[in-house]
C-alpha cells in the first residue's frame, strides 16, 4: 500500500503539455528510461540515485537532474521519505522551438557542497512553479504563459552544465557494479520482453 499522506500530481500529458510535476512518497521498484528531462528534489528523508555511472544518496533539499534516455532508479532509503519530481518531455515540444536536444543535458547531482549554484537556481524555479500551479483556480485555471516561461528557464539552467570527468562522478554504493551490469543488460535488451530473472543471470 502506497503512502498517500504526501501526494500531488500535475500531469501535463492530460492536455498534451510537456511539463509534469508530482509530489509523493512512493517507493520505486524498477529502473526506468524516459524521453524527458527529470528533476527529482528530496523534500523529506533520503533517496539513492542510481544510473550506470552514479550511485549516490541525496538527502533533504538536494536534487538530481536526470538526462533524457538515462536508465535510472531513485530508491527510497527511509520509510517516510517524500520526493518532488518534474518531467519535461521533449516529445511534446515542437523541434523548431528547441532544435536538437541530443547530448545537451547530462545527469548531475546538486547538493550544498557540489553544484550549489545550480541547486539554488533550480530551487528558485521549483518554488515559482509550485506557486503557479497552486495559485491556479478553477475559474481561470493555470497560467500557461508563466508555466511555459518557468519550464524554458529550467531547461536553460540545466543545459548549461558541463560534463563531469568520469573519475569525479559520485559512486557510493557497494552494489554499484551490480547496478551497472543490470543497467547495461536492460539497455541492450530494452525493446524485448525481459524479466528480473533474466537480469539476475
Segments (PLM) and residue ranges:
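Generic protein-terminus/edge-of-domain signal
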Residues: 1-64, 69-70, 76-78, 102-104
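Ligand-binding loop in jelly-roll beta-barrel domains
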Residues: 69-93, 100
